[in-house]
Amino acid sequence: MPSQFDLRIRSVDDVRLYDIVEFHELEAPRLFAQNGALAAQSLRNSGLESIVLAVGDVEYTWDLDDDGSLRIRRGDFGRARADLSEAWFSDLIGNLRSAVAVLVSGEPVMTRGNIMHLIAWESTMRSLVDGWPSYEVGSLSFTDLDGDPLDLSRSFRLEDDPAEMMRFLSQAGFLLLKGVFTTEEVAVMNREVDVLQRSATPEDDTTWYATIAGENEPRCVRVNDLPDGALGISMTERLGGFVGFCEANHEFDHIDVLMKPVDVVEGISDLPWHKDCSLGLHSYQCLQIVCGVSLTASGPDNGQLGVVAGSHRVNLSQFGLSADIDLPQVFISTEPGDVTVHTSCTLHCSTPPIHSPRRVAYSTFMMEGDTKALETRLREVRDQAGRDTFAPS
């Protein structure tokens, strides 16, 4: 039986080019028969009235007809309009790159409207292509193994009942493990982070920088793609057993170290609401399990992880959080040595430190499968965004 944590419906063998005419004229009619009602519901829920997708001089309008059914017709009849390259259109349909990746890349594709219209369209397109229903207000509940309401404030320890922990994680999309690392082990990891930060250079593609108020030189705030043991302690040995309870053959992939200072005025340090699969490859890689080792305390004063409970279970915008979404928002406070766990599809954010810096080391565990080659363009987009300077929101 497939694991509840394995949502993959594509593999590298499914990668192909999608032509705008062939997709709309040949594939869309078949998809309409299967998922047309879901896609219409998704478009209604998105708030998007209409959008034109164009590649060169070929244009198709997506909207709802008078009966409320999804309508796709050739020509420009919509309010928003996205002029895409052949590669971008193909990657969007095939889920190799997403509309959020278009946003982050800075590609000027919106002839009319704004990039949020394309992001809204993508949820509708995923309903049509993949049969993934959009979120309906009030449609999710959270229950424990006994069917009772789930206590979203609950925390666990590694020795707790695996079935209870996996039920919590599968329902909520996040989990807090207390006391995973000792004070001495946290000190070891912090010393290694000190070395990483001192030795970082802007020329290193794996580092991100930000400008701090009152400082002339940008400061390294993130080092990506570190191997197991890079912080002096094996994450596989400490966390691999817990991740194994997912029963989806997850394996350690990499560590990203985040060093979040106070008073960032430029650069990416604290991200707004997003999913880790926001840039693409959801249907090839999710659910990844992301374990965040708290190297400092976290909370309202020095920043913390915020999650939208249950967001990994539904099709909603990959970026930002609509006021219409009624799912619980949970902000997690930690002590050094605690570990937050979230899935790659869980909508989450990071609040900025106010009084003291925050450090966290995120270990990503991925399922077996040769998808590394598909990540190249996504990593280029991600790392370029981290190296460029953006005013924080």
Can you annotate each of these PLM segments?
Residues 85-96, 239, 268-279:
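Short acidic (Asp/Glu) patches
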